[in-house]
């Protein structure tokens, strides 16, 4: 190598090493490969072009474009005049590739830094693995391998592009200037209702200016897709949802895509899917819903909102006793007992050795929330807070699915009333479904255990993954987008974090 070539190589290496010094993984990669280029050498054209093409689609994925910035990298490549410039661009492209790969496969945000109620284990692929893949593999295949593969993600991305096209075409028309509307009504508000339903795809174009049967059917379809009571009348809640603009729906879809990236792992062929804002639990098998039931989730107050996490269901307990959570004991029951020692008489007071303590022997007034030394338990009974069966997937949150004697809450549209656990509307049917995978007499065996009145644990021979999720935007079985209210306000917080990271709404100003 001549002196000029040596000096150029030295300038490239020194510039690359200096630029990569602040990133240990990148610096280590180039040291171990003797500073072999990935992007800026003459033989790197295909890899370079594939990366630039991939990151140019960042906006389509609802990812922060400035984090990868294909345009800026292209300009940097074209304007690199010296070997020092080339060394800097080499590292910039590697950083963009790693950021792109990490964000696509595990999300652009760290969820628990955004909301403590989102407990997702984000398993990010190590940089050296990602770099080895792109260095040794066919570039386009490697970049395709990074893309989320779930059908839901693909459908969300399609919905995102569709909403953006609708926004560019003028949106969904004027807001409905009415609190509520009903079949038979006429006037400007009904025309606005008609026009929005047409633009949303629920109603065929029409000049009809009255709330007729076709409009009633369209409203019913809208209600079904938005978790509303499907009565065909545009009541206050329905009008409020109809008036939500496409920009807000777009935010919901982008947030849902980020949540999908957090769950970029094998969800198993068979699993339980509890979508909190939908107030429903499903068993999914081979991509199809084989069981579905309404649920009640935690109240929208601190410490009672149901968390988002994944675990495995291991067993069910028939005729369960209820071990009262410490928070309920000291916040709710202790004050009652201090006023009246015979309050909540259906609950037993238990000492540290597991013995039932006579209430007359306890001076409840002598204890504070911190010093109260007893636990409390409700034995199996018809009025037990957990009903007749609970479904356990042991976790640090002490969250599980269970029956309840309070059935009336399942008729409500918004079902956020528990202390955090998931109450199930059809617990016996759920038990039968779970047991049917391990016995031919599921119903009979369940009923036999139930009739004993005794607490009975039934282990599941095959543990079942359980995913508690929070999607306010998701495709239904036919691929049509459905939306739910942001009951805990988590989507609003996530959108704020994504926006701060550089995610923008395409075609929306301000």
Where are these regions (language model features)?
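Cationic-aromatic interfacial patches
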Residues: 1-122
């Amino acid at each position: 190598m001549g002196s000029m070539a040596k000096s150029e190589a030295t300038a490239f290496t020194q510039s690359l090493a200096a630029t990569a010094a602040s990133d240990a993984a990148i610096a280590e990669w180039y040291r171990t490969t003797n500073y072999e280029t990935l992007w800026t050498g003459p033989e790197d054209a295909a890899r370079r072009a594939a990366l630039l093409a991939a990151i140019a689609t960042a906006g389509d994925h609802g990812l922060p474009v400035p984090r990868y910035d294909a345009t800026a990298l292209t300009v940097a490549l074209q304007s690199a005049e010296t070997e020092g410039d080339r060394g800097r661009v080499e590292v910039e492209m590697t950083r963009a590739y790693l950021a792109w790969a990490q964000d696509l496969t595990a999300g652009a945000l760290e969820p628990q830094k955004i909301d403590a109620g989102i407990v997702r284990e984000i398993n990010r692929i190590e940089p050296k693995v990602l770099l080895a893949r792109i260095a040794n593999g066919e570039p386009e295949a490697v970049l395709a391998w990074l893309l989320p593969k779930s059908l839901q993600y693909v459908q969300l991305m399609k919905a995102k592009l569709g909403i953006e096209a609708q926004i560019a075409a003028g949106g969904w028309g004027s807001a409905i200037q009415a609190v509520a509307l009903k079949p038979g009504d006429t006037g400007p508000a009904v025309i606005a209702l008609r026009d929005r339903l047409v633009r949303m795809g629920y109603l065929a174009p029409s000049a009809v200016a009255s709330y007729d049967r076709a409009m009633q059917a369209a409203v019913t379809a809208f209600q079904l897709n938005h978790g509303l009571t499907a009565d065909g009348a545009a009541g206050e809640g329905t009008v409020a949802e109809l008036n939500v603009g496409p920009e807000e729906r777009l935010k919901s879809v982008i947030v849902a895509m980020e949540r999908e990236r957090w769950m970029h792992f094998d969800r198993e062929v068979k699993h339980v899917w509890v979508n909190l804002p939908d107030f429903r639990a499903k068993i999914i098998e081979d991509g199809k819903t084989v069981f579905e039931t309404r649920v009640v989730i935690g109240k929208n107050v601190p410490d009672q909102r149901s968390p988002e996490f994944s675990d495995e269901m291991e067993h069910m307990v028939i005729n369960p006793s209820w071990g009262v959570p410490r928070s309920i004991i000291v916040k709710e029951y202790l004050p009652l007992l201090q006023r009246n020692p015979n309050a909540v008489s259906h609950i037993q007071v238990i000492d540290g050795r597991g013995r039932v303590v006579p209430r007359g022997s306890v001076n409840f007034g002598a204890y504070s929330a911190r010093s109260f030394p007893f636990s409390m338990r409700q034995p199996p009974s018809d009025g037990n807070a957990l009903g007749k069966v609970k479904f356990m997937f042991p976790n640090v949150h002490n969250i599980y699915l269970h029956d309840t004697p309070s059935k009336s809450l399942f008729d409500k549209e918004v079902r956020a009333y528990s202390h955090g656990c998931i109450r199930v509307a059809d617990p016996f049917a759920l038990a039968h479904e779970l047991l049917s995978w391990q016995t031919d007499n599921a119903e009979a065996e369940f009923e036999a255990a139930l009739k004993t009145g005794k607490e009975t644990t039934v282990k599941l021979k095959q543990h079942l993954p359980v995913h508690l999720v929070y999607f306010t935007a998701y495709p239904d079985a036919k691929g049509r987008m459905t939306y739910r209210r942001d009951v805990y306000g988590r989507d609003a917080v996530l959108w704020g974090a994504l926006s701060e990271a550089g995610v923008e709404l395409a075609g929306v100003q301000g």
